Amino acid sequence: MRHVGDRGEAVVAAWLQTQQCQILAQNWSCPWGELDIIACDPGGVVLFVEVKTRGSYNWDRDGLDAISPSKQRKLILAAQAFLESQPQWQEHPCRFDVALVRHQRGAYHLHHYLAQAFTLDSIK
């Protein structure tokens, strides 16, 4: 299953680069979990991108339902850990995005990109 996720993340990273984003890290891990993609957009905003890759027929709205409030909290804690470990990015504004990738018969494509899918306030 990790292979499917890796392919989906590669599609999203490539798309972000076409949007002039700089990829800062992929699969960054800490005790809180893993951040799929960390990027910086042309305006200097640090993007924490959660990628969900699913087949055409799935039960969780292409992975969107898997981004529960609990998952959001873990992503926020992981993002804080990343920023603590990388002080050069601490003063930049940050955003939490979700990328939904579909795969069918070996083909992967970015189905939907949700910029600012959730915020610190959305999980209170």
From Swiss-Prot:
Gene3D superfamilies referenced in this protein's UniProt entry, alphabetically: 3.40.1350.10
Record-linked Pfam families = UPF0102
- MF terms per GO, please? nucleic acid binding
Concerning CDD domains, the annotation shows: PoNe_Nuclease
Q: Which domain of life is it from?
A: Bacteria
Q: Which protein family is it in?
A: Belongs to the UPF0102 family.
The name on file for this protein is UPF0102 protein tll1737
